[in-house]
Structure formats: structure tokens, C-alpha cells
């Protein structure tokens, strides 16, 4: 318990609030100070790796873009493969895609078709769970590829945006782990 409290305090101390960014009234949670601190970054990726191992994942999917920064080193520490999930049109070759709705419009994410297969247990890693749209689409994409969802792990969950409630049906019993609740 003390170790978790210490990690929580360390992570929180390295996240900067930027008021009125990207627009007035928004408080942006800037993780770049955390990434610049080797002790904090190592603690974060170590915690994500531990969750990956605990839930029996064989691969980590990192969501563009900060999910790449967190997911790749966590995958190395956990001894599992890393798969980037990109915005549509960014991956060469054969891909699987999944569209999802945004507040005003829609978006699409992709993964290389051969990167996820039956028998894979996949942990989704990202920096923030906000509304849950991208995470929900990634879970659909993982299952369409024939793989199993081991869970979703994020640095922080912005609870007031309702992402957890949106994800619950798509998780189908898989865990959602947030290191920080904001």
C-alpha cells in the first residue's frame, strides 16, 4: 500500500496543470514533466508493466500518440510485444480499421492486420481515459482481429468525462486500471 501511495504521489507531482489549453475553461494535464523525470517515468512504465503481467497479457496495444510513449517501454519491461494503433492512413500494408464517433464527427483507427491473432491477450495502454471513444474502438478492433482483451491500463482517468461508463460494455468483464483518478 505504501509503495502505491508513493508512486501516486510521485506521478501526481510530475503532472502539470495548464489552464485554458487548448481552449478557455479547459485545464490540460501535461505529462511532459513526468516523462522528463527518469524516476517518475520508470515508476510509471513499471506500474503499467506490472498490470500487463498481472492480467496475463501477451501484447500491449498503445494508442496514438502518448500510448506509444508509455506502452513501448512497459512492453519491454513486461517481456511482451508492442503494437501501435494509429490514426487511419498512417500504417503501410494491410490493416484492420475501426471507426468511432466523436462529439462532432467521426474518426478511425488502424492496426496492421497480421499484428494481432487468435491466442493473443492484449492490454491497451494510453495516457488518459477521457470520454472512452478511442479505447472503445481499440477493444472492438482487438476482438475483430481474433485476439482477447486482457484489460485497459491508463495513467489517469478523467472521471467527470464518463469514459469508464462508456467502456464497461465493451470491456465485457476485462479490467480497467487507472493509476490516477482525476
Curated annotation (Swiss-Prot):
The gene is apt. The keyword Membrane does not apply. One of its GO terms (molecular function) is AMP binding. It comes from Streptomyces avermitilis (strain ATCC 31267 / DSM 46492 / JCM 5070 / NBRC 14893 / NCIMB 12804 / NRRL 8165 / MA-4680). It is found in: Cytoplasm. Its main location: cytoplasm. Pathway: Purine metabolism; AMP biosynthesis via salvage pathway; AMP from adenine: step 1/1. Belongs to the purine/pyrimidine phosphoribosyltransferase family. Keywords: Cytoplasm, Glycosyltransferase, Purine salvage, Transferase. Catalyzes a salvage reaction resulting in the formation of AMP, that is energically less costly than de novo synthesis. The keyword Cytoplasm applies. This is Adenine phosphoribosyltransferase. Its EC number is 2.4.2.7. One of its GO terms (cellular component) is cytoplasm. It catalyses: AMP + diphosphate = 5-phospho-alpha-D-ribose 1-diphosphate + adenine. One of its GO terms (biological process) is purine ribonucleoside salvage. Homodimer. Signal peptide: none annotated.
